[in-house]
A protein has these predicted regions:
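Extracellular Cys-Trp
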Residues: 216-257
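Non-catalytic substrate-recognition and accessory regions of acyl/acetyltransferase enzymes
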Residues: 1-98, 102-215
Length: 259
């Protein structure tokens, strides 16, 4: 049977070390398919706060290293995710094994549980459309969602057509459109100053993407201790009762008695 194992390094150091050793024995060739060197895997494990492991009948099929990143707010960052290609097969007993998507979903579920603002990762160029399909978006894309979708479609088409020149041109458009200011702020010491150098850097390190959790509305008609928090939201209004104050949606015109 397949399952996703979650290990918090601070709370379970012994278990974390045990699985880390198992991952290092198998990861470079089997799990990461020779696409990630051993040094980077070791660094990702050492600096991570959590391990997410895809295990099938006692065998590790994939893993993800995740750490807390306090840059620009509270969020968690996936530093590395590897999953064996054999994870897509059906076992002899007819039980399908879990793939990389299950790892992502487990990480998102944990991020939502601990109430982070978003989950981030650096997507290598080949998988940008895949992560977009899972709900990850570019930085500053909320200003132009239509353009983001258009560029993603173009990027996927160029990749499927093996058009490397066109692929780089589209990637350059993405960097210029969504990441010019972002890269200047976060990586100004590591990368060049012009757009071409930023594209090379992005292709090497990956394009930063994030899955943003929608903030839960407080306009639920429940009593509140701090009315000012409700008043800050344009879609909310404060209703004062005899003993309590309530936060409602502005569209709610129904009178509430005995308050």
């Amino acid at each position: 049977m397949s399952k996703i194992i979650f290990i918090h390094k601070k709370n379970n150091k012994q278990e974390y070390n045990k699985y880390s050793e198992r991952i290092l024995r198998a990861a470079p060739k089997t799990l990461c398919i020779d696409k990630v060197n051993r040094e980077f895997i070791e660094e990702s494990i050492d600096t991570a706060d959590y391990l997410f492991i895809n295990e099938t009948r006692g065998e590790i099929r994939g893993f993800a290293t995740v750490y807390h990143d306090n840059f620009d707010g509270k969020h968690i960052h996936i530093s590395l995710i590897c999953n064996s290609t054999t994870s897509n097969i059906i076992t002899r007993k007819g039980v399908p094994t879990l793939g990389g998507k299950a790892l992502i979903e487990s990480i998102l579920a944990y991020g939502k549980k601990i109430k982070v603002k978003d989950v981030r990762l650096d997507a290598i160029k080949e998988v940008i459309p895949y992560y977009y399909k899972l709900g990850f978006t570019f930085e500053n894309s909320h200003y132009n969602k239509d353009k983001e979708e258009e560029l993603i479609k173009q990027l996927r088409k160029a990749y499927l057509n093996n058009s490397n020149t066109e692929f780089k041109q589209i990637l350059r458009k993405i960097v210029v459109k969504f990441y010019s200011g972002y890269f200047k702020e976060k990586f100004q010491h590591d990368m060049g100053k012009n757009d071409d150098e930023r594209v090379v850097y992005a292709m090497d390190r990956g394009i930063p993407m994030k899955f943003v959790f929608k903030p839960q509305s407080i306009c639920k008609g429940k009593s509140i201790k701090q009315p000012n928090k409700c008043a800050k939201h344009k879609t909310c209004k404060v209703v004062n009762g005899r003993k309590r104050s309530y936060c409602r949606k502005t569209k709610n015109t129904r009178k509430k008695y005995n308050i």
